[in-house]
């Protein structure tokens, strides 16, 4: 993180759920902490507050090694909205300025392909939570459920999903194919 911070004029995001890694990352020049567990581990909330960094709160059902084993929701979009709303309340309760916080619905993290597409179709519901919505749809396996393509052949579909997400309220798009995604978004925004 230190080397990246010294060589690049950009915000460095560190993906971690471990409070000690959060603290060290903040000391080394990270600009954003991205926690797939939504800052739920012991001491994660306070460590995030103490860091002063921007935060990305993500939804994930289950744990990484079991999250894709029969994920179940009563209503995938409402359940995720409620989870993120509760996490935002917890962040605020420890003194975190919510202007520092973005939310990520966690496409592909404890969701079936059908649940991911339902989430994308109704993504604007999450915009109502008042925080910028970040999406990571690039090369996701949900694409292969429709197109049956390996990850390296999912660029066009990934760009299409990014456009759909922005149209439905996403403000930050995580992408593998940055140039293609940026070109498509630039063209889309001209109309």
Where do the PLM segments sit?
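Active-site-adjacent loop and "lid" segments of alpha/beta metabolic enzymes
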Residues: 2-11, 16-22, 26-27, 31-90, ...
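Short acidic capping loops at alpha-helix termini that bridge into adjacent secondary structure
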Residues: 10, 97-100
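Conserved C-terminal portion of the radical SAM core fold
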Residues: 94
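Active-site metal-binding loops of divalent metal-dependent hydrolases
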Residues: 107
